[in-house]
Amino acid sequence: MKKVLITGFEPFGGDAINPALEAVKRLEETSLDGGIIVTCQVPVTRFESISAVIDAIEAYQPDCVITVGQAAGRAAITPERVAINVDDFRIPDNGGNQPIDEPIIEQGPDAYFSSLPIKRIAQTLHESGIPCQVSNSAGTFVCNHLFYGVQHYLRDKSIRHGFVHIPLLPEQATDGNHPSMSLDMIVAGLKLVAQVVIDHESDVVVSGGQIC
């Protein structure tokens, strides 16, 4: 039986909730076809976030890791293609850190690509009625920081990993200026992501790019 670690960030930026954390609470010990989901909570703090996930990886010894964070402004679940080696925080993280144009890993590669079948994920969720599309930018805040840091840690290991952004919850989008997604749909989507990941190592050859 395969084990999938799904991680969720704590609230940040003045929000009382984070849909990533709310989703992983529901997903803990969820059974998959041929697998099980384990979870962990991640601080929205530079470097501490990476350490928390590494600790969980070493404790659970998963086959795959899916790190998850919220993305205000996105209407779909978005598996990320690439993490870049730069921290450029528009706001401070929960530890008060606000690096500008600093590398995450000194002398590290410029970027790491997801090792998950991101296009197959997008295709499968879309066919299941859950909005999903590939994203080509994970930003430069703690989500990208974690994505890059975990990929760096796993660079010589057989554990596959990728980052997935999810929309805000309806209760976070009351101003009417941001799209949202119900927690039930987010949970269903992430469970399906996990199933795709354990079922498929290779991706489908379809367009997932954007003009700009």
UniProtKB/Swiss-Prot annotation:
Its EC number is 3.4.19.3. It is found in: Cytoplasm. Disulfide bonds: none annotated. GO terms for molecular function: pyroglutamyl-peptidase activity. It catalyses: Release of an N-terminal pyroglutamyl group from a polypeptide, the second amino acid generally not being Pro. The active site is at residues 80, 143, 165. InterPro entries: Peptidase_C15, Peptidase_C15-like, Peptidase_C15-like_sf, PGP-I_bact-type, PGPEP1_Cys_AS, PGPEP1_Glu_AS. One of its GO terms (cellular component) is cytosol. Keywords: Cytoplasm, Hydrolase, Protease, Thiol protease. CDD domains: Peptidase_C15. GO terms for biological process: proteolysis. Its main location: cytoplasm. Homotetramer. Belongs to the peptidase C15 family. Removes 5-oxoproline from various penultimate amino acid residues except L-proline. This is Pyrrolidone-carboxylate peptidase. It comes from Vibrio parahaemolyticus serotype O3:K6 (strain RIMD 2210633). The gene is pcp.
